[in-house]
Amino acid sequence: MRVWFWLWLLLSVPAKGETIRLYDYHQHPPFNTGVDAGLSRELVKYLNEKLGGEPRIELWLVNRARLALEMSDPAFNGLVAWVNPAWMGDPQRERYLWSFPIMRDTNELISNSEHPITYRGPDSLKGLVFGGVEGYRYQGIDDAAGRGELVRQDAKRVKTNLDLLVRGRIDVTLVSGSSLSFFIDSEHYRGKLFISPFPQSSYTRHILLPKSRADLHGRLNDIAEQMDKDPRWHKVLESYRGTP
């Protein structure tokens, strides 16, 4: 009798749903603005609400190198937030599944205010030292560096490049339009940086899924489509357009 009781008890306990990691390597505003704060956490909250907890999405903050290591595993089963196919070696969208856009963004060219650079095309950067972030890919920039038309010098963080720019150690860097005001409005940089009136590029941000998650792909696309029309989500985005 006792055996049947324990068997009934075991079967009556609800099975724990699947948890999937949402990787994010953007360790700067607006995506991460402090402990347990930032747009990435808002995204996780929104996705979990729309998915009804099945599966449950869990945020994992990593650097670009760690993400590359995780994704090199053939059994990789996570999602990656805020990325573009061109950055992930998948311009034709053949290696991974991609959600509809969840954000539209730009790359803004920043230079020292004492030596302002206006971006009018790749030739604007010839002979300059460009400050990049380790592991990041830059359309147009990387090709020019490969041809020897400019020098790419990497740092670990966006903020480090802005500090190097102020000190004259590099000539230009790129900051995403979504992040720009978080840095430029800082007292530390005020009046010291020049923003080109023309962005270096514009692009869309997506959620990457492995090919094995076709079951989730359609659901995330439905959510991404809703996000674009959801006033509540637009209000969240708007709240991260300036300095916290």
Explain the meaning of each model-derived region.
Residues 17-91, 132, 154-155:
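Extracytoplasmic small-molecule ligand-binding "clamshell" domains
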Residues 79-92, 171-201:
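A ligand-binding cleft/hinge motif common to bilobed small-molecule-binding domains
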Residues 24-27, 103-108, 185-224, 243-244:
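Periplasmic-binding protein-like
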Residues 58, 65-78, 158-179, 186:
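Short helices/loops that flank or line small-molecule/ion binding pockets
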Residues 41-50, 113-116, 128-129, 207-240:
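Extended ligand-binding regions for polar small-molecule ligands
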Residues 27-46, 113-147, 178:
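Bilobed "Venus flytrap"/periplasmic-binding protein-like clamshell domains
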Residues 55-56, 136-147, 225-244:
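Ligand-binding clefts/hinges and TM-proximal coupling segments of bilobed small-molecule sensing domains
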